[in-house]
Regions:
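PRY/SPRY (B30.2) beta-sandwich protein-interaction domains
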Residues: 1-264
Length: 264
């Protein structure tokens, strides 16, 4: 059984609690809880999603409203509270599965289980670009497919799935994932997450999230109007077959508490 309302899409959680460390802070969240920036000088501001999933296949999008200096990260976090992250330590790094950017020309693709903060080692791979695309910047839409049952992730930019060395990604056909990980090691709930750094004297990065509620990203671009295979969502680009919008209608619910199945 699945929950009835399709209107409850994942947003960014303004009520998320700061961690105990100064490098575990919730950023500023605006525009219907979909737009985020750090708001904390010389720190990453983190924004986690309201919906977590342990299993399934999910499609999400991020829009780079402002490509700030020096870095940002989008993806998923294994855990239910923001963790310590400053870009130079290994604490909690293994709990991220993400695409990130650090000033220069590199995309970083990081799977669950990575503990490296140095590009090119321990599965943290730097790419001057995907071999078929450039580094994403202001005005670009980042696409992501996650298969939490198989431990695979795909990333793309502006409607084109990235090639990180083995051919262009093809999530619909389970081909050429950009990232893989051991499912059993990260079996608990995962939440979408966005990180932005704010640095004095530089442009601050701003990113807008779309779990299927608004393909215009709060009016920043023209609508896409693409739904998932169940008919839910409004995405800029079409979700690959089998990958769903992160909304209540696509989340399983036990018959024991489903109003449609109980007598109460």
């Amino acid at each position: 059984q699945y929950m009835a309302s399709s209107g409850n899409f994942c947003t960014l959680n303004r009520l998320g609690a700061d961690g105990s460390d100064t490098n575990a802070r919730v950023g500023t969240i605006t525009k219907g809880n979909l737009h985020t920036y750090s708001g904390i000088t010389d720190r990453y501001g983190q924004a986690m999603g309201t919906h977590g999933v342990a299993t399934g296949k999910w499609y999400t999008e991020w829009y780079i409203s402002v490509g700030g200096f020096p870095s940002w990260l989008v993806g998923w976090y294994h855990g239910n509270q923001v963790g310590k992250y400053d870009g130079s330590n290994t604490s909690n790094v293994a709990n991220f599965c993400s695409m990130g950017y650090f000033t220069g020309t590199y995309i970083y693709l990081t799977p669950f289980g990575n503990t490296s903060t140095s590009g090119g080692t321990s599965n943290r791979q730097p790419y001057s670009s995907f071999t078929n695309q450039g580094v994403p910047t202001t005005g670009d839409v980042i696409m992501n497919c996650m298969d939490f049952d198989a431990g695979k992730g795909w990333w793309g930019i502006n409607g084109v799935w990235g090639d990180s060395g083995s051919g262009a990604g093809d999530p619909a056909n389970d081909s050429n994932p950009n990232l893989t990980w051991t499912v059993a090691d990260y079996a608990d709930h995962k939440f979408p997450i966005t990180l932005n750094w704010t640095q004095s004297g530089h442009t601050n990065g701003e990113i807008t999230f779309n779990a299927g509620q608004d393909s215009t990203f709060s009016g920043e671009i023209t609508a896409g109007g693409n739904a998932d295979g169940n008919g839910f969502g409004d995405f800029k680009y079409a979700p690959p077959s089998g990958f769903l919008a992160l909304c209540s209608a696509n989340l399983p619910i036990s018959d024991d508490i489903d109003p449609a199945q109980t007598d109460d």
